[in-house]
Amino acid sequence: MGITGSLTPDQLDFFHSQGYLVIESFASEDEIRGLRKRMDELLNQFDCSVSSIFSTKNQKHTTDNYFFESAEKISFFFEEKAFGDDGKLKQPKQLSINKVGHALHELDPLYKDFTYSSKFSSLASSLGYRRPVVMQSMYIFKQPGIGGEVVPHQDNSFVYTDPQSCTGLWIALEDSTLVNGCLWAIPGSHKNGLVRRFIRGDNGITFDQPSPSYEQKDFVSIEMKAGSLIAIHGDLIHQSFENLSSKSRHAYSLHVVESDGCKWAKDNWIQRAKMPEPLYVLP
């Protein structure tokens, strides 16, 4: 099938030089409203007696079968600070979930329609993909008051192919600001290559190298209006701080890899019985 790329030469130049690109008004108000409404429905149906705690600081969830099995399911992960000393939720479950993942784009019809729409195919085509596959999808809440920090990282660490091919696509479903925990990145850091990998072995998952230290002065804040999308190169160093405000920061995030000539690593944390359906296939 023929796919027409949606990015201009200037946009592509910025992406390749800086390692990221913000596209405003990527999602319409109706699409945002629909995605958020559907997530409310999923949360209301969710049995919170079966779940896991998510943290990028403490990787204890990585030995959790619930986490492994989420690769091909719609699974719910609590914020670290959602529970009191008595082990009970300190607020309603709707305000306690860190994220929902990792197969929304396959298993929920509304999220699948949005993910497999022509706008994502056009974007992937502009970025040079021939047979792009969405390996994971996440709805991220960044809850008010307890939304956890996401430490500096590279997406290729977690979503690794040989050769490397990951691009993160992150859509703001609410305004993302300095107040509620917007993204930060080190422009051009993707040119330095991959620092470390997150590897699944017999004893769970660990990083193969310690985390480097980064100077906060090297990061720039990336504030975004609801409906905007940021494309993130797989080697770009990026992070977000805790959300200590009274406002949430909902987002829908995808990680795309090339399946034409790129091999999915057997020691990635995501190991699936079947690869997802590609967004499109070029001849």
From Swiss-Prot:
EC numbers on record: 1.14.11.18
GO BP: fatty acid metabolic process
Knockout-associated phenotype: No visible phenotypes under normal growth conditions.
Matching Pfam families: PhyH
Cofactor(s) this protein cannot do without: Fe cation; L-ascorbate
Binding-site residues for Fe cation, renumbered to this chain: H153, D155, H238
Record pathway: Lipid metabolism; fatty acid metabolism
UniProt keyword terms in alphabetical order: Dioxygenase, Iron, Metal-binding, Oxidoreductase, Vitamin C
Signal peptide: none
Reaction equation(s) it catalyzes: phytanoyl-CoA + 2-oxoglutarate + O2 = 2-hydroxyphytanoyl-CoA + succinate + CO2
GO MF terms, alphabetically ordered: L-ascorbic acid binding; metal ion binding; phytanoyl-CoA dioxygenase activity
Recorded coiled-coil stretches: none
Binding residues annotated for 2-oxoglutarate, in chain numbering: K99, M138, H153, Q154, D155, W170, S240, R249
The family this protein is said to belong to: Belongs to the PhyH family.
Role, per record: Converts phytanoyl-CoA to 2-hydroxyphytanoyl-CoA.
Protein name per UniProt: Phytanoyl-CoA dioxygenase
Taxonomic path: Eukaryota, Viridiplantae, Streptophyta, Embryophyta, Tracheophyta
Gene behind this protein: PAHX
